[in-house]
Amino acid sequence: MKTQFVILIVAIVILQLISQSEALWGALLGLGSTLLSKLGKRGVQNMDQFDDIFEPELSEADLRYLQDLLR
């Protein structure tokens, strides 16, 4: 009974490794390319990619629209 349980656990672990290996290799390759790109000058880039989305000032039209929306 113990042997069957051990075989079952080993089989489950092996199946999990097979099914997750694609994600593991993708993560490792992605991490490697990220590290390599950060080492060179070309890896330095502007990380403020969401500055165009956020606008701190609201115009009068925006305020009117929000007031109409919240009524």
From Swiss-Prot:
One of its GO terms (cellular component) is other organism cell membrane. Keywords: Amidation, Antibiotic, Antimicrobial, Cleavage on pair of basic residues, Cytolysis, Fungicide, Membrane, Secreted, Signal, Target cell membrane, Target membrane. GO terms for biological process: defense response to bacterium; defense response to fungus; killing of cells of another organism. It is found in: Secreted; Target cell membrane. The modification Leucine amide is found at residue 39. Expressed by the venom gland. Residues 1-23 form the signal peptide. Residues 40-71 form a propeptide. Antimicrobial peptide with potent activity against bacteria S.aureus (MIC=9.3 uM), weak activity against E.coli (MIC>100 uM), and weak activity against pathogenic yeasts C.albicans (MIC=100 uM) and C.glabrata (MIC=100 uM). Is not very effective against P.aeruginosa (MIC>300 uM). Also provokes high hemolysis on human erythrocytes (HC(50)=4.8 uM). Belongs to the non-disulfide-bridged peptide (NDBP) superfamily. Short antimicrobial peptide (group 4) family. This is Antimicrobial peptide VpCT4. It comes from Mesomexovis punctatus (Scorpion).
